[in-house]
Amino acid sequence: MKRVKNPELKLLAEQLPPMALSSRQDKTVKNYLAGFQKWKQWCNKYDEIIPLPAESHFIALYLLELSNSSNSHAPVSLAFYSISWAHRSAGLNDPTKGDLPKMVREAAVRKLGQGNNKKEPISSQTLSMIIQKYANVDSDLMELRIAAICLLSFTAFLRYDELSTIKYCDVLFGKGYMKIFLESSKTDVYRVGEWVYVSSLDSPNCPVKIVKRYLRKAGFDSYTEDFIFRGITRNKNKHKRKLKTSNKPISYSTVRSLLLEVFRSVGKDPSVLGTHSLRKGGATAAARNAVEDRLFKKHGRWRSDKSKDKYVKENLTQKLFVSKNLGL
């Protein structure tokens, strides 16, 4: 862009970097920037390597080193896509399109696989135990927050990023349901937002009733753009606890530690569970109850069947179904 001399073109050129950055989700850009920074730090150790524009064979060597020192292919893939993104954003040829970088990344994926830290889904029975424990008649704000987080994550298939950014003005109640506006999600590339609908249930586990209880307990009673899930003040009298006044969404580390403690409290092994276990559990329950595939995919905001299918864990009956129905 240094070659641009015309004043009008210069003004447009100044708008180009932020426009290019906004083509990706903020979290993705942040990850790519961090990944490219690590590549630069590695390059600085060697006089012969330039990080931008980079040469394919040096990228391949970097990916190989990452592969040798990692237990998962994730760092290799992040480095690969970060370097690619940085070059394309700078208007340069993408050196990761060379055969060597691609071959090293593919070998790392084959060698290291997806890792062995996949979390198990939470069952509807386990969720019922959680609701019984944390949403009883004497529950305080902190306990109701846990119940609301668990139910919304399970019934609306929410990721942490979607859950944590829900504002009070994003939640609307109708007759027999509620709908929640998600300003953005992992698959919402163009950030247009999307409504997700959750039905009322004739059950103690009704997500609509419990979310309403939580919102009343938290003091929400008029239009506000405050986040509904925030930190909670400490008080020896648990019924005097309140949401913190600072409008900051609940952090990932807080949600994770809360959920692991909740899972432990109902007798589940927290080492095989995580924040994604609720979304995964809801998806698995929907699949086992033969929810129409199109609705299933839309409700979970998945781009592809492959992405969606990763969330579903078949039981033994389902695994045997195919071989039982071959006409033999």
Functional labels for PLM-detected ranges:
Residues 1-328:
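Extended, non-catalytic subsegments within catalytic or DNA/protein-binding/adaptor domains
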